[in-house]
Structures are given as C-alpha cells and as structure tokens.
Amino acid sequence: MNAISSTSAVQTVHVPLGERAYDILIGPGLIARAGTEIASRLKGRKAAIITDENVAPLYLDALVASLDAAGIVSAEVVLPAGEKTKSFEHLITVCDKVLEARVERNDCVIALGGGVIGDLSGFAAGIVRRGVRFVQVPTSLLSQVDSSVGGKTGINSPRHGKNLIGVFHQPDLVLADTDVLNTLSEREFRAGYAEVAKYGLIDKPDFFTWLEANWRSVFTGGSARIEAIAASCQAKADVVVADERENGQRALLNLGHTFGHALEAATAYDSRRLVHGEGVSIGMVLAHEFSARMNLASPDDARRVERHLREVGLPTRMSEIAGELPPAEVLMEAIAQDKKVKSGKLTFILTRGIGQSFVADDVPASEVLSFLREKHP
C-alpha cells in the first residue's frame, strides 16, 4: 500500500506509475496554491483551463490569479454544465481552444470542475498533439475520490452508452481542494459519497464500518472529511497501480456501475431524474442483492448496504427514480454494451460479503434479466 503523507492540513497520496507517477493533494486552500504546485512540477508556462458555467463564477478567477502569480499564462473555456457535455461536439470545441491557446506538450490542460469536465478535458489532453500534460482540480466529492484519479477519460455515445469513447491519460497532478465542497448541494455531496462507500464495499470492510459510524462527520467537514477522501484516493491508487489498463482487478472499481450506467442510460442522462452517484448507489444495492440471489453472499449484507446508503439519504431502489423506466429488456441492452463485456459475455462485479467483491465472468444473461424484471418498479 502506498503511504499517505501529511503536511499541515494537506494530505498527499502518491501514485507510483514510473515515469507517469503523480501526487494527489487533498486539503483546504489548494486552488490558491495551484500555480505554485503546477509550476514546481511542469516545465511549460501555458495552460488551458476547462470548466463549466456552474463552477466558473465560483473558482475560475482564483485559479487564474494563482497561475498568473506563478508566471503561467492561461486561456479559459467555459462549457455548459451537465452529463450531456460529454459529447463529440464539446470535445471538438475543447480541442480547438487548446490549440488556439498554443498549448504544447510541456504545457497543460487544467480541468476545473466535476467528473464531466475532468473526463472531457482529460480526453482532449490525451489526443491534442498526441498528448499534453494534464492537471485535475476536481470540484465535486465524486470527482475528488473517483474520476480525477486513475487516468480514465472519455465521452458518452448517445446511442450506445456512457464512457464508451475515450483514452487512458494519467494526470500529472490532482489538487483536491476540500474547501470547494462547501458549495455543493446536499444532493451532489450525497451522490459523491456513494463512491466513498464503494471503496469499503470493494475490499476495505473496516473502512465501511468506519463510515457507518462517522458519516455524519464526513458530511459536516473537517478532518473526518479529509480522512475519508484520502482513504478513498489511496484505495483507488492501489488498484490503479496494480492494473492501470483495467485488464483484471481494476474492474472492481466498477462495483455498482454496470447496473448504475444502465439506469443512467435509461434516463437519457437527465440529472433531474438521476445523477451518477445515485445510479451507483442503486447499482451497489442491486449488485449485493444479485450476489445473494446467486447464493454467493448473505442477504444480510445487501440489507446492511441498503440501510447505510438509505441512512445518508441516497436512493437504493429503481422505484425511487422519477418518471417511468424502460422495460427490463431495454436495461439489458445497455448492460450488454458495458465496457467490461468480453467476447460477448456479461461481466459483473459481485460480492461474497462486505469488502469481498470480485470480478464475475460469464454471468448468465437469463439470470440478470429475471432479476431485473423482479426489481423493476
């Protein structure tokens, strides 16, 4: 396990990937320090900041000022907020703006925003000039603990599903400023918390038990919040280092995502109905229930997972999604397009208990369809 180091209120998680190793800094005040941190690590002195119309009024000026003070000249691109921004149209816009800004390989693209902005910006950084440097400044809990770490980037296919078009492009630095989480809505913070809980459910049962006892302190802020984010980043870093390209165990990070992504596709990525973390929450409960159905785990584990997620205010049932859902057969079509499908065989992340997740190959489609029909509202 890679050690978490701490300087004052800031914790550092190091991701040792050889020449592509990088640090994740977690703590307050990091946007104000961004220029100094970037200048000390990267040679280039130009940057293209990619952000959205929700985040820009809150943090763009502070980031630009920090870069300017460090001698880094920046150009800014402000995009619409929301999952639908992860499209070819906006990817082309970002690539054009990065090229217009004369960003070269030693310069950087900076993603200032949540998972959508990070995924889109990272994809652009990975393909412009065949790869420029990339810095993540995640502004949501979900992006701080998940999408900003590990190098997965991409956009959605409007016809086939979520995150199906993209590249692996590791960041050079992640600055997780915990102060920005104070401006999130309760719904956004809860959605991000689903990914925090996921790490305990994958292979850290003690962390899940700690969350059951301390989740209120994580929501309130302070040291418990920083500790939870650092532990989550460390958990993801460990998996990424062991399996960077998702050839095996990295797929564990998709616990709850096979069902969750299908539900997101079924709602046409309409955030008024369902956001990613809510889909993951429902998906994790479904994964534990399906595991129990397949006699792999105790039904008590599924009930425990649902109890905790419901306690923090997350949805745990498909019936809680606003509006009508398509029939189970349509959900199965989305599942069949999942990135983990190999040679046409369904692959799920299932569990033998809390913190005992595993990659299950060749899951019978008939069993999944029957299960979805049973759970469909």
From Swiss-Prot:
Organism from which the protein derives: Rhizobium etli (strain ATCC 51251 / DSM 11541 / JCM 21823 / NBRC 15573 / CFN 42)
Stored Pfam families: DHQ_synthase (PF01761), DHQS_C (PF24621)
Biological pathway: Metabolic intermediate biosynthesis; chorismate biosynthesis; chorismate from D-erythrose 4-phosphate and phosphoenolpyruvate: step 2/7
Subcellular location: Cytoplasm
Upper classification of the organism: Bacteria, Pseudomonadati, Pseudomonadota, Alphaproteobacteria, Hyphomicrobiales
Gene designation per UniProt: aroB
The enzyme's E.C. designation: 4.2.3.4
Keywords tagged on the record: Amino-acid biosynthesis, Aromatic amino acid biosynthesis, Cobalt, Cytoplasm, Lyase, Metal-binding, NAD, Nucleotide-binding, Zinc
SUPFAM superfamilies reported in the protein's UniProt record: Dehydroquinate synthase-like (SSF56796)
GO BP: amino acid biosynthetic process; aromatic amino acid family biosynthetic process; chorismate biosynthetic process
Biological role: Catalyzes the conversion of 3-deoxy-D-arabino-heptulosonate 7-phosphate (DAHP) to dehydroquinate (DHQ).
Location (main, coarse): cytoplasm
Any one cellular-component term (Gene Ontology): cytoplasm
Protein name: 3-dehydroquinate synthase
